[in-house]
Every structure is written in C-alpha cells, then in structure tokens.
Amino acid sequence: TSSATVLADDPALTVRWQELSADTQALYPEENLRQPLRVVIDSQNRVTPEHRIVQQAGETLFARLRADARQWPESARTLLVPEHNGHLDLVLLMMLLGKQQINSVWVEAGATLAGALLQAGLVDELIVYIAPKLLGNAARGLCALPGLEELSQAPHFKFNEIRQVGPDVCLHLTTA
C-alpha cells in the first residue's frame, strides 16, 4: 500500500481470523494463521510508529527514499529504494522484494499507486470489487493513468472469474 492510504484510512492490513466464514476457519485453524508482510511505499516518511499498520502482529516493511530517524518497533523495517522519474522506483522495489523471496504481492491502494503499478507493467492480475453505485465525472477513478485517453492505449485484461459478493461484483482479471 502507499503512505497516502495509511494516512487516509489507518488500515491494519491483517488477516482477521474472527471475520472469516466458518468454512474458512475450519480449513485454517487460528493457531496456523500467518500474517502477511505489509509493505508501505512511504517516499516522504509520512507514516509514524503510531499508525495501526505498525502496531499489528507481523512485520511491516517501509520502502523509502531516505532513512527515518524516529524510534520504530523491531517489527518495522526500512528498505531504501532510489528515485526514478521523481518517484520511488517501483520496478526496483519489486526486484528487491523478489531477492527476499517475496514473489507474490497483493496491493491495496488508491488510484495513484494502482495507476503507477499498471504503467510500470508490474500488474499481471487484478481483483476489482464493483458496488452497484455510480459517481459523477469529478469522482476519483480506479487508476490514475495520465495520458491514457484512447482504448488503443489501454492495458488489456481477460476475465478469469466474475462473481457476486453480497451486493457487489468481484472481477478477477489477468493480463491478456
């Protein structure tokens, strides 16, 4: 996720066993639950040790342009990643994560990070939830993709699965 998401939502980004269905709980006993490594892209060092993401069980990795002088718990690590075109180098970040045997990355992010990952060619699968609600043209879009104005420029995906989840629809897409 990005620091913008952490600042806006203060998410935990944890697996909450008690919120899983009874069938899923039966498959995965609570004592076997493993929390994911949370990776936060925080190029301006805006996230603090007081945010919920840092206070959860499991490890949090901060991808940053420079070190942060604050006192952090042992569960928080920093990975320094150089800048590319004015932003943290996302391609290099993924390569560095791969060197740590992190080969699958789930991203929960807003339009800016989602768009940057798409533009960098780092997305091979999308899971998109769509609510049966419409917003106007001034609302924030799913992905910030500046300069993409014609269908011929659009990234191509194929549908793997379409299912209803409560009142919403879940689209599972992979690159075409």
Regions found by a protein language model. Name each.
Residues 1-103, 112-115:
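Active-site ligand-binding patch in enzyme domains
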Residues 5, 45, 112-115, 139-144, ...:
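Short, flexible micro-motifs
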Residues 82-85, 132, 163:
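Structured beta->alpha junctions
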Residues 110-113, 122:
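A generic "binding-loop/recognition-motif" signal
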Residues 119-157:
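Flexible, gly/pro- and Lys/Arg-enriched active-site loops
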Residues 146-176:
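Conserved histidine-centered catalytic loops in small-molecule metabolism enzymes
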